[in-house]
């Protein structure tokens, strides 16, 4: 419907553009109404006094609650969310306890950014209420709202020189640089802390010419890293902007290490010929993640005079003609709207992994399972488009390099990764088929370049299947995949990554996969029938002929990964794509300024990280750490450009 915007303070002629849809976090109107109804129902219950326990599945663990009742009241709750994502679900116990005790019901608003964990807490409390009352208690779970209300009332305004939307890899770097340069900056984060973004938990960035590399005599030159990434892109990215990003590597390291967050250097996992990927290992070798990684940077930012606000979901730009002069954000806890006025706005909201509609729009109606947080729902992209921006051409996904997943699994999110030994066959280089039972790729791409090339190929079919005979099953379980293929010296990934890998839990895990319907065991014909793989038997026959000949005439996979599949017993495992993040966003110039359809910069609007569609290739760069490295460095580059523009305004 027609959007109306009411402002508590005069907007001085400044207008706000039309509201675009968003995936709001927990706490919708429907949820609030249900909470009121449930509270009335709960008030009518009587309980058998005592303490009751229950569990419910969270995003990474079983959430456990212990609820103590008197005859007519919930007296106390102990909530254990320690196994949930640090900085997100693991931090909500006290808030959920407060909400439930105050309302005396399980149907309360959840915590923004931790919807799945919130729902698990409520479900477990409902179980305890049912036990104590002898009455079945149902819970109103939070759902993702699709739209903001037609009428937005701006209840307050804040002023700054710059507003950075998103405390992820790009946002935190930009905020640090801006405030250090004396630019009064407000940093907004949709989640409940600085430790919820992918940038705060991802393994490590690919960077060039850093002190960390120099200390190990392993310096990667800007030229080497740039040529790798720009060459891979075939010129489809903004080369000038990418070069600026690649050149900013040491500044990323400085921002971390000078503020007490140690960094190290990873091995060359995929045979790139250089060691660009860093890590965040502390001096004891433990990888630092979440708030432990980002809080020292936020502390520096605020010590310099910056303002950091959480639970702020940006929903629309503030326009003055064609210029962006601010952003309106929703306080997701209090359900109010705040207008942030600024001379420069940076959008760095982390992509669209939490927006299934957008994933389907670009990749078809297939299941793509996010392993990352799902707060990033494409809202940043929408804001730029509303301000007059346009999309760039490269849309891609950063796929799971640790194996396959399937939606029939009980686990969700990051806990899906390596939770079952059968998932590993997806990247072992053996026979893979599509839903017709046909080969559809050179399986070595998925083994050697799973983040980019192999992952891209899996998107073409939606579901893909590993075909394993009894010999492969047993040898991979007991000896490892490297031994199964005869320890080929030419297989770099195998000889460096799989030398010690066995599958000790494969029997138990295969039984689970079969029970849940994403794997089958039997004759080849039985396996084909179970998944409707009509061409499977002929495909295996053709594949075996290629193995016997020592030459793959279809996809030319290296002969050392060709081994016949024989015998009476087979296993077929069904996989679906899973992702760490998304690529594809708005077009910018080489100064990270959003551009309009005439290719002219939109004054006051900048874009960094994966929201910037001009610095990421499709498929994703083949060197590991490129996504995170480019996100961090693009925040610095955007800040440099913002500072220059503000000085010259």
Give a label for each model feature.
Residues 247-336, 356-357, 404, 547-567:
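Conserved redox-cofactor binding core of oxidoreductases
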Residues 44-142:
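Active-site- and interface-proximal helix/loop "cap" or "latch" segments in soluble metabolic
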Residues 152-168:
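Beta1/beta-strand and adjacent pyrophosphate-binding region of the FAD-binding site
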Residues 1-13, 17-21:
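N-terminal secretory signal peptides and thylakoid transit peptides that target proteins
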Residues 381-383, 390-530:
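An anion/pyrophosphate-binding glycine-rich loop and adjacent beta-alpha core
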Residues 158-160, 335-344:
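Core beta-strand elements of the Rossmann-like FAD/NAD(P) dinucleotide-binding domain
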Residues 78, 316, 534-619:
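A glycine-rich dinucleotide-binding beta-alpha-beta segment and adjacent secondary-structure elements
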Residues 340-408, 628, 637:
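Glycine-rich loop(s) and the adjacent beta-strand/alpha-helix scaffold that form part
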């Amino acid at each position: 419907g027609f959007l109306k915007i009411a402002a508590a303070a005069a907007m001085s002629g400044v207008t706000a553009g039309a509201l675009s849809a968003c995936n709001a976090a927990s706490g919708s109107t429907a949820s609030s109404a249900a909470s009121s109804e449930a509270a009335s129902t709960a008030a009518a219950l009587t309980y058998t006094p005592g303490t009751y326990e229950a569990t419910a599945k969270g995003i990474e663990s079983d959430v456990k609650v212990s609820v103590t009742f008197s005859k007519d009241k919930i007296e106390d709750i102990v909530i254990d969310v320690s196994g949930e994502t640090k900085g997100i679900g693991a931090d909500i116990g006290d808030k959920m306890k407060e909400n439930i005790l105050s309302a005396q019901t399980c149907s309360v608003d959840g915590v923004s950014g931790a919807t799945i964990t919130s729902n698990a807490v409520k479900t477990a409390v409902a179980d305890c209420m049912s036990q104590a009352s002898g009455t079945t208690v149902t819970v109103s779970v939070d759902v993702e709202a699709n739209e903001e209300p037609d009428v937005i009332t701006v209840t307050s305004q804040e002023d700054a020189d710059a507003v950075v939307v998103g405390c992820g890899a790009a946002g935190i770097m930009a905020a640090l640089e801006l405030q250090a340069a004396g630019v009064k900056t407000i940093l907004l984060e949709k989640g409940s802390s600085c430790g919820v973004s992918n940038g705060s938990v991802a393994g490590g960035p690919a960077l060039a010419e850093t002190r960390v590399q120099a200390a190990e005599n392993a310096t990667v030159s800007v030229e080497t890293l740039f040529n790798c990434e720009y060459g891979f892109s075939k010129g489809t990215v903004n080369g000038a902007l990418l070069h600026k990003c690649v050149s900013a590597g040491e500044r990323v390291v400085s921002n971390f290490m000078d503020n007490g967050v140690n960094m190290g250097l990873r091995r060359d996992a995929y045979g790139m010929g250089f060691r660009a990927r860093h890590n965040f290992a502390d001096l004891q070798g433990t990888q630092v993640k979440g708030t432990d990684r980002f809080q020292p940077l936020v502390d520096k930012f605020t010590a310099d005079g910056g303002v950091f606000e959480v639970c702020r979901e940006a929903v629309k730009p503030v326009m003055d003609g064609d210029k962006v002069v601010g952003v309106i954000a929703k306080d997701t806890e209090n359900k109010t709207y705040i207008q942030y006025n600024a001379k420069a706005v940076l959008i760095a909201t982390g992509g669209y992994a939490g927006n299934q509609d957008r994933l389907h729009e670009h990749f078809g109606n297939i299941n793509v399972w996010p392993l990352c947080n799902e707060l990033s729902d494409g809202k940043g992209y929408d804001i730029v488009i509303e301000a007059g921006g346009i999309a760039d051409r490269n849309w891609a996904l950063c796929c799971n390099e640790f194996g396959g997943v399937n939606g029939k699994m009980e686990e969700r999110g990051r806990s899906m990764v390596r939770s079952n030994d059968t998932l590993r066959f997806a990247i072992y280089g053996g026979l893979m088929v599509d839903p017709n039972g046909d080969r559809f790729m050179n399986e070595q791409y998925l083994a050697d370049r799973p983040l980019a090339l192999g992952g891209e190929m899996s998107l073409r079919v939606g579901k893909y299947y590993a075909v394993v005979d009894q010999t492969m099953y047993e040898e991979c379980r007991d000896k490892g995949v490297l031994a199964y293929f005869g320890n080929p010296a030419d297989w770099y990934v195998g000889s460096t990554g799989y030398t010690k890998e066995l599958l000790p839990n494969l029997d138990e895990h295969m039984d689970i996969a079969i029970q849940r319907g994403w794997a089958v065991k039997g004759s080849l014909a039985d396996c084909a029938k179970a998944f409707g793989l009509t061409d499977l038997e002929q495909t295996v026959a053709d594949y075996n002929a290629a193995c016997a000949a020592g030459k793959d005439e279809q996809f030319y996979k290296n002969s050392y990964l060709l081994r016949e599949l024989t015998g009476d017993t087979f296993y077929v495992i069904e996989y679906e794509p899973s992702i760490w993040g998304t690529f594809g966003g708005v077009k910018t110039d080489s100064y990270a300024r959003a551009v309009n359809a005439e290719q002219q910069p939109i004054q006051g609007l900048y874009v960094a990280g994966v929201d910037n569609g001009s610095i990421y290739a499709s498929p994703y760069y083949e060197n590991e750490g490129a996504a995170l490295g480019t996100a961090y460095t693009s925040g610095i580059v955007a800040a440099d450009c913002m500072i220059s523009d503000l000085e010259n305004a």
